[in-house]
Amino acid sequence: MLAAFSITPLGTGESVGNLVAETVRIVRASGLPNETNAMFTNIEGEWDEVMAVIKECVDAMAQAAPRVSVVVKLDHRPAEPSGRIHRKVESIEQKLLTED
């Protein structure tokens, strides 16, 4: 399963980078394939392990913020092999190369 998620602390002031960095540390420590970009963190794994990582991130953020906003988008294809986090992007890049 692929998950794209964003966790935002509310009520902590304008700068939230340190809190967001802590959640990225949690994701990276999970050992699951992941990527972080300007808006979301993507993570790949089995349903239970992905959701456990997201929960751990939310719980950590809730320790530092009185309110936490969470956005999650899931792509669940149980019959597909792992590695989709990179293959999906590679597929689009290949299509762009062949259309030029």
Language model: regions and residue ranges:
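Charge-rich, low-complexity N-terminal segments
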Residues: 1-100
